[in-house]
Amino acid sequence: MSRLQFQLQATDGHARRGRLTFPRGTVETPAFMPVGTYGSVKGILPEQIRALGAEIILGNTFHLYLRPGLEVIGDHGGLHGFARWDGPILTDSGGFQVFSLAHRRKITEQGVTFSSPTDGARVFLGPEESMKIQKVLDSDIVMIFDECTPYPATEDVARRSMELSLRWAQRSRDAHDGLGNDAALFGIVQGGVHPDLRSRSLDGLQAIGFDGYAIGGLAVGEPEHERNAMLEHLHPRLPAERPRYLMGVGRPEDLVEGVARGVDMFDCVMPTRNARNGHYFTSFGTVRIRNAKYERDLDTIEPGCGCHACSSGYTRAYLRHLDRCNEMLAPMLGTLHNLWYYEKLMADMRAAIASGTFVEFRRSFYAARGATTPPLPGETS
């Protein structure tokens, strides 16, 4: 029996305001989870992550299993002690990383055999192995092991992939329970961009029973309108009393559109990765700091922003200088800004849902970018 509790506190249209409660803390939803692939959110300290508003982070089962390995993490009592993060952690199952290996993997009914990207050794990973690894990591949310359906995929390929993932979902459930793990276990809805396959996947997962439901395979190159169509299809079918997690999707616009379609949880490397490439997110769009127009710009990244970089007065000209000189401080300050922006965006959406003003919030979000608000189902542009 999982110790996760989910309370749905308010709705506004399809947007949902809720709270996840774990023994290690609470998470207000909708929530964005910074990604700590190797047990670290690149460039910042755990206490800085907490200070900028994040309440839960994501760890990568696949990479942590390969390096440093379970013995080292086990010596620390799990990933929380290893990474010095005392809040909730979600660990992915490794399925997406195996998917990304493409030609270096072989998929069978039992699982996936692949060449390790670290040393080339042959490694096997299946549902049972993934559940054992995540038990050692001692994460608060465990993800089932699944096959991430590629895009594009024919309906037949998507169907066979979805059916394999359903069989693996049952094995994940059985292995998780057999280990006596009381962490939350989330199922993952697959089926590509085929509504009937998505429905069948969700029906099968609900028959097994999970603490939450993730929507996978929608950050693999599909057009935005097809992703949104799948979210719209799933919204009335997903159980209202369970949290919903859209995996790997992360432009600011994607977060707003996901929340508008009933999503509670998001993760993406975009705010941290883009910061390392000199792309800083703001309410009016993206500041690409390598652009020559910022060479003598005395403004902060976003005037009035409360992040450490902006509130301390670091100018765009200074950040551009640091970036051009490959100084470590540039990605550190950029990461602090981008994650602050993402977490504030989520906080603003939570407040708008609670006050019944999400429609107005969404309209003002696009207006600040000089963009037209895209219509939701039933609306006209």
Swiss-Prot record:
Residue ranges, annotated region (RNA binding): 248-254, 272-276
GO CC, alphabetical: cytosol
UniProt xrefs under Pfam families: TGT
InterPro entries for this protein: ArchSynthase1/Queuine_TRR, TGT, TGT-like_sf, tRNA_ribo_trans-like
Active site, UniProt feature: 92 (proton acceptor), 267 (nucleophile)
Enzymatic class: transferase
Top-level taxon of the source organism: Bacteria
Residues involved in Zn(2+) binding: 305, 307, 310, 337
Key words, A-Z: Glycosyltransferase, Metal-binding, Queuosine biosynthesis, Transferase, tRNA processing, Zinc
Example GO molecular function: metal ion binding
Cofactor: record remark: Binds 1 zinc ion per subunit.
Residues noted as binding substrate in the record, renumbered to the chain: 92-96, 146, 190, 217
Cofactor: Zn(2+)
Keyword rRNA processing carried by entry: no
Description of how the protein assembles with itself and partners: Homodimer. Within each dimer, one monomer is responsible for RNA recognition and catalysis, while the other monomer binds to the replacement base PreQ1.
PANTHER family: QUEUINE TRNA-RIBOSYLTRANSFERASE
Function, as annotated: Catalyzes the base-exchange of a guanine (G) residue with the queuine precursor 7-aminomethyl-7-deazaguanine (PreQ1) at position 34 (anticodon wobble position) in tRNAs with GU(N) anticodons (tRNA-Asp, -Asn, -His and -Tyr). Catalysis occurs through a double-displacement mechanism. The nucleophile active site attacks the C1' of nucleotide 34 to detach the guanine base from the RNA, forming a covalent enzyme-RNA intermediate. The proton acceptor active site deprotonates the incoming PreQ1, allowing a nucleophilic attack on the C1' of the ribose to form the product.
Family assignment from sequence similarity: Belongs to the queuine tRNA-ribosyltransferase family.
Full protein name: Queuine tRNA-ribosyltransferase
Organism from which the protein derives: Xanthomonas axonopodis pv. citri (strain 306)
Lineage of origin: Bacteria, Pseudomonadati, Pseudomonadota, Gammaproteobacteria, Lysobacterales
